[in-house]
């Protein structure tokens, strides 16, 4: 028997700035199924991951919410871990890139690259926010597209015309953080000399480590010539400071992949049988696989292997690249309710439904996967409930009723049993190759054969015939053994169903090798329902809940003014246009005798005078200070008769009340009576 393989597996690190959604889950479920298969085969497979916890976006969100960056990433990590656990994703370790292991490894790798001559420095001119006192990444700059003239476009590309450009080409640039007009400022940046590794990368990307389509795409980039990679960011920045460079921080994409190593190192400290160098050393005989989406191929297939090579570590055995998730043939949409968070799904549906559906659609390629919700319901109900679970539910009752739950060892259909055993190597080969859809097709073809044979034998009819009880037990006994085989084949995909089946079968946790054996003269436990059908109404409820998630997300987080007083219900333009707002000159302002809160304002609105009572006394203890000021006035508000006289309209002010009331005023140049539009 061959030695167990040593395999280290990672999924891309989710960013610690938001919730996990079903698009993310495609990758983690795919990776988890592959790792579970390897463990069932007896291999030493280790699955590590971590939250990607650095960057300006995290720093700015924490600032908005009035908490520290550390508090934010701790809360998000706890949320992520809960979602993954409930989706049955079984990491050996889930860490954070904001860890001492990652700080030490990132600094050590950088210093090795620097000392080997692979780091360069040069001044870079970029936009700087004078209000926030920080340099702005491309996505934190907005302005008018220099190509098509569309306003409110990001600093690197236009969503209207698709053009790409430098931030300095934007017209009327503004900071997306503060709204200030940015200024150009020079700063010293640190660069990784990626071209030093061009020859190695050309060889490695054609070594079989990548799918062919991915290798072809990388060849285009390699043939066009590699550029140095900017690996530094200026303070303020949430991350690790570069050694010997005060105020300079590693760009998030430098320390993020090193987070794979850091998570494994953290695990090694708790599992003495694991040796860090045995998996990461330059001459390591272990296998290393990264499961990633096609949007981050360049980081993992160019920068990452070059960093590892330059720092004296091994390179990945392979990158397993997948496509995006679409829902009902379209990009996930918040407004349609198809941008579904992991937790929203879990609130409505069994995670194994989605695990199976993804498995039934996932192949080796990088094509996008479509979650068609009608097909999802039909496939799960037909395959899992109607085929697999149906075998056990059909047969268990006869064994308990006719033989006290003892499964006999007869084999009334040797050709059928042989077909199941002969299918095992092909199913294993499909799992190994990540051809999950092929594995599921072959498993369901076996389930169809088992169900057809049981229907042909009709134990429910035999049970009514005298002298046929032994045959009933033989048929149902084989049926349960075939069900057990199917459970073994499906266990990497459906671990919860497998655990429930193991309890019913009264067996220890099943391994892949168990498909070679049969249960005989074996006591079963009472049968309990193993899986229920998906109710379409629950899918609809999930979609509606996702729309509610969008509505909740549109409300700002933290303690800002919109949280204290949310935006009112939407109105159409005609309703707004019906309000006649005018510029008014406050000619006279005085106390109102007997009123605790009111001031009387005498207004000039051009060709007319108006008398207004306003509850702003607490903020303006000296009414005469308002005389001569211009303000905004609602001119067509119906007059209101009050104890102290008639109020003819309303002046506009902001603030929560008390001393915090701020009368609104127009810019200089406005004239009494002018309409506000």
From Swiss-Prot:
Gene Ontology MF annotations: ATP binding; metal ion binding; methionine-tRNA ligase activity; tRNA binding
Listed GO CC annotations: cytosol
Residues given in the record as Zn(2+) binding sites: 145, 148, 158, 161
Matching InterPro entries: aa-tRNA-synth_I_CS, Anticodon_Met, Met-tRNA-synth_bsu_C, Met-tRNA_ligase_1, Met-tRNA_synth, Methionyl/Leucyl_tRNA_Synth, MetRS_core, MetRS_Zn
Residues reported to bind ATP: 334
Protein's UniProt name: Methionine--tRNA ligase
EC class (word): ligase
Organism: Pseudomonas aeruginosa (strain ATCC 15692 / DSM 22644 / CIP 104116 / JCM 14847 / LMG 12228 / 1C / PRS 101 / PAO1)
Subunit structure: Homodimer.
EC number of this enzyme: 6.1.1.10
Record field: catalytic activity: tRNA(Met) + L-methionine + ATP = L-methionyl-tRNA(Met) + AMP + diphosphate
Motif 'HIGH' region, chain ranges: 14-24
Cofactor: Zn(2+)
Motif 'KMSKS' region positions after renumbering to this chain: 331-335
PROSITE patterns assigned to the protein according to its UniProt record, in alphabetical order: AA_TRNA_LIGASE_I, TRBD
Source superkingdom: Bacteria
């Amino acid at each position: 028997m061959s030695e167990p393989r040593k395999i280290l597996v990672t999924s891309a690190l989710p960013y610690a700035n938001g919730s996990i959604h079903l698009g993310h889950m495609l990758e983690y479920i795919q990776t988890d199924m592959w790792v579970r298969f390897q463990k069932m085969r007896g291999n030493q497979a280790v699955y590590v991951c971590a939250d990607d916890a650095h960057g300006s976006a995290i720093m700015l969100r924490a600032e908005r919410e009035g908490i520290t960056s550390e508090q934010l990433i701790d809360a998000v990590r706890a949320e992520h871990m809960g979602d993954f656990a409930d989706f049955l994703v079984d990491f050996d370790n889930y860490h954070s890139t904001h860890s001492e292991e990652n700080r030490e490894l990132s600094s050590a790798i950088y210093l090795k690259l620097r000392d080997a001559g692979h780091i360069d420095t040069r001044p870079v001119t970029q936009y700087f926010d004078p209000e926030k006192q920080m340099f702005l990444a491309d996505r934190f700059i907005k302005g008018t597209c220099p190509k098509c003239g569309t306003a409110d476009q990001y600093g690197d590309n236009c969503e209207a015309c698709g053009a790409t450009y430098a931030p300095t080409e934007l017209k009327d640039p503004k900071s997306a953080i503060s709204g200030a007009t940015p200024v150009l400022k020079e700063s010293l940046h640190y660069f990784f000399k990626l071209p030093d590794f061009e020859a190695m990368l050309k060889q490695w990307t054609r070594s079989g480590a990548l799918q062919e389509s991915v290798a072809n795409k990388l060849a285009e980039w390699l043939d066009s010539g590699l550029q140095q990679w900017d690996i530094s960011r200026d303070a303020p920045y949430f991350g690790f400071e570069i050694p010997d460079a005060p105020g300079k921080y590693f760009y998030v994409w430098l320390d993020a992949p090193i987070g794979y190593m850091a998570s494994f190192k953290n695990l090694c400290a708790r599992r003495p049988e694991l040796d860090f160098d045995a998996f990461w050393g330059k001459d390591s005989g272990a296998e290393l696989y990264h499961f990633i989406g096609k949007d981050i191929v360049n980081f993992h297939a160019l920068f990452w292997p070059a960093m590892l090579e330059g720092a004296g570590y091994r390179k990945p055995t392979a990158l397993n690249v997948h496509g995006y998730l679409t829902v009902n043939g379209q990009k996930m949409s918040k407004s349609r309710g198809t941008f579904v968070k992991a937790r929203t799904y879990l609130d409505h549906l069994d995670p194994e439904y989605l695990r199976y559906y993804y498995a039934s659609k996932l192949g080796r390629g990088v094509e996008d996967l479509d979650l068609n919700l009608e097909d999802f319901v039909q496939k799960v109900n037909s395959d899992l409930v109607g085929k697999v679970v149906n075998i056990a539910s059909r047969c268990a009752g006869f064994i308990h009723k006719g033989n006290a739950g003892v499964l006999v060892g007869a084999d009334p259909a040797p050709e059928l049993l042989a077909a199941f055993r002969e299918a095992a190597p092909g199913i294993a080969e499909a799992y190994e190759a990540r051809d999950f859809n092929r594995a599921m097709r072959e498993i369901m073809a076996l389930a169809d054969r088992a169900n057809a044979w049981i229907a042909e034998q009709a134990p429910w009819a035999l049970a009514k015939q005298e002298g046929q009880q032994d045959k009933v037990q033989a048929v149902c006994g084989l049926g349960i053994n075939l069900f057990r085989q199917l459970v073994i084949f499906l266990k990497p995909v459906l671990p919860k169903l497998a655990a429930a089946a193991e309890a019913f079968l009264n067996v220890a946790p099943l391994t892949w090798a168990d498909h070679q054996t049969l249960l005989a003269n074996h006591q079963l436990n009472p049968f309990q329902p193993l899986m229920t059908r998906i109710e379409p109404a629950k899918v609809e409820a999930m979609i509606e809940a996702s729309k509610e998630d969008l509505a909740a997300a549109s409300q700002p987080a933290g303690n800002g003014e919109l949280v204290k007083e949310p935006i009112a219900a939407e109105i159409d333009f005609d309703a707004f246009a019906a309000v006649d707002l005018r510029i008014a000159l406050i000619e006279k302002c005085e106390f109102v005798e007997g009123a605790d809160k009111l001031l009387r304002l005498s207004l000039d609105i051009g060709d007319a005078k108006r008398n207004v009572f306003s509850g702003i006394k607490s903020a303006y203890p000296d009414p005469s200070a308002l005389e001569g000021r211009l303000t905004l006035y609602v001119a067509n508000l119906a007059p209101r008769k009050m104890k102290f006289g008639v109020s003819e309209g309303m002046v506009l002010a902001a603030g929560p009340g008390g001393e915090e009331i701020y009368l609104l005023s127009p810019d200089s140049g406005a004239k009494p009576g002018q309409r506000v539009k």
